Amino acid sequence: MAGSPGNELPLLQLQEVDSSKVGESGGSSGLLPTMYNGALPALSMESHAVCIPSPYTDSSHDYAALTFYSPPILSHGGPAVPESPAARQSLSPSLFWPAHGHHGHVSPLALHFQQPLVYREPAHSPWAEPKPLEHGQAQTSKLAGKRMAESEEGTSSVGGCFAGKGDMHFCAVCHDYASGYHYGVWSCEGCKAFFKRSIQGHNGYICPATNQCTIDKNRRKSCQACRLRKCYEVGMMKCGVRRERCTYRGARHRRMPHIRELAGTGGGARTQRRGEGVVPQTQEAQSSALTPEQLINRIIEAEPPEIYLMKELKKPFTEDSMMMSLTNLADKELVLMISWAKKIPGFVELDLSDQVHLLECCWLEVLMLGLMWRSVDHPGKLIFSPDLKLNRDEGSCVEGILEIFDMVLAATSRFRELKLQREEYVCLKAIILLNPNLCTTSSENREELESRNKLLHMLDSVTDALVWTIAKKGLTFQQQSARLAHLLMLLAHIRHLSNKGMEHLSNMKRKNVVPLYDLLLEMLDANTMHSSRMSASYSSQPSPWSQAAQSQPGPPPSCSGECPCPPKESSTI
């Protein structure tokens, strides 16, 4: 980066600073980085402007492209970019490679995908050739990344400021940015500290109102009783494992090695193209050029193998033993589901945050559909695995699960009536995964729109494959349309069933009936967080029906008597 002696670098003028103000705020962390605070020599402020040479004014380098390089694999050369962990940390989102000691948070699935390739920068780039970070530098980065909370509420609003957009988590209590996974849920520093004080000390809080106070980012301090009640409602547990006090990254690195290595070889071609822009488009071209028959064969090949509980079952079941068996199987299936999704043609071409988000939102629907497919030839039974086959009445030992069993059996019976074929099953499973409504955001940039367009194209391809599968049965056009409609309508039933199952799992977690496994627990919390954020966004938007009612005051028109509306009853409220 050093220029030739003959070329003078342009000068940048620094703003004149009053020395008195510097002395007053010298200990503020807002002026100096944390690791240099108080360690720099005193600066003598004079009355004239200070100018420094700027190596950046004539550079045409696009710094936005650098945000996808990670500090653990880059070495920075030259004085243009200081060799400080703070500088490296600000240029690397934790979505792909979380920095050591980082207080941002990785989505439950982000670490399951392999890190994309990194390519050499152009000659004019100030960055050196990528190479592994030395151990000493990693330790320095870890120390520099640790930020102390200034107060209970002060840092919770900025806990996720370094996290990528697709990597952001919110507090389950107040919906502020979450600083980590604490006491069983994602929470900010403020709510974590409040819950800790409440369970360790005095907690005889009394609500001055009706025990229904709104707890959000701005009003979380208004009522301690309602805040503690909401902490318990979202699943905070007194007996939460002490490891949950650490950041999400620290907990994830203690997971079993085979789960961290599930990513295989597909890290997402989108992230590779961002590094240089010259990555071959072979994989994307192949995925878009597949015929319906080839696409179905690829999806069938991606199907995961059968899993076994591999535990001795004692009957009759108890609530604990059944929930332990079901959650154990679900956790094993989630591990295989990640590999399955990455083998769907075109899935790894999506933005990494979209891949993670899709899996977080549809995982229970995929599990439910798989359960129905295994049980379709066994009327009255649910085949969770070859060594765990349950009758309907065996679910009575678990509170609330009998209703879910009945709904699963009803949907399975409908699939049996339709004589569901394997090709149709795998297409429906892929359609559940590729739901584009799960990736909508309020503000979409060009990259997000590009990823969404790819997702829509993939969904069209899978839908065409499903239509082709139905058409080859020799049915008439009317029969084909009717069968397609019946199959797609069952997806809405599966979504409703998934919501019921998610609610039941959340209740089991709050009651501490059975300890959930790591991956299952993270997926459950991620889905719950997405649902709460979506419901909050919907509630903030006025309904068109309410607007119409406000624009037309007065009693609503009475029914003519021909509609199925129930008769009105006088209200005594």
From Swiss-Prot:
Q: Which SUPFAM superfamilies match?
A: Glucocorticoid receptor-like (DNA-binding domain), Nuclear receptor ligand-binding domain
Induction comment from the UniProt entry of this chain: By 17-beta-estradiol.
Report the residue ranges that make up the NR LBD domain in this protein. Answer: 291-527
Q: Which domain of life is it from?
A: Eukaryota
Gene3D superfamilies linked to this entry: Erythroid Transcription Factor GATA-1, subunit A, Retinoid X Receptor
> Residue ranges of the DNA-binding region?
171-236
Q: Where in the cell is it found?
A: Nucleus
Q: Which GO terms describe its cellular component?
A: nucleus
Protein keywords: DNA-binding, Lipid-binding, Metal-binding, Nucleus, Receptor, Steroid-binding, Transcription, Transcription regulation, Zinc, Zinc-finger
For this chain, the annotated S-S bridges are none
Instruction: Extract the ranges annotated as region (Modulating).
Output: 15-170
Q: What is an example of a Pfam family matching this protein? A: zf-C4
Q: Where are the zinc fingers (NR C4-type)?
A: 171-191, 207-231
List all Low complexity biased stretches. Answer: 534-552, 559-573
Molecular function (GO) terms for this protein are: hormone binding; nuclear estrogen receptor activity; sequence-specific DNA binding; steroid binding; zinc ion binding
A GO term (biological process) for this protein?
estrogen receptor signaling pathway
According to the UniProt record, where is the region Disordered?
534-573
Which tissues express it?
Liver.
Q: Cite the record's note on assembly.
A: Binds DNA as a homodimer. Can form a heterodimer with ER-alpha.
Q: What is this protein for, i.e. what is its function?
A: Binds estrogens with an affinity similar to that of ER-alpha, and activates expression of reporter genes containing estrogen response elements (ERE) in an estrogen-dependent manner.
Protein family membership: Belongs to the nuclear hormone receptor family. NR3 subfamily.
Domain description: Composed of three domains: a modulating N-terminal domain, a DNA-binding domain and a C-terminal ligand-binding domain.
* Name of the protein in question: Estrogen receptor beta
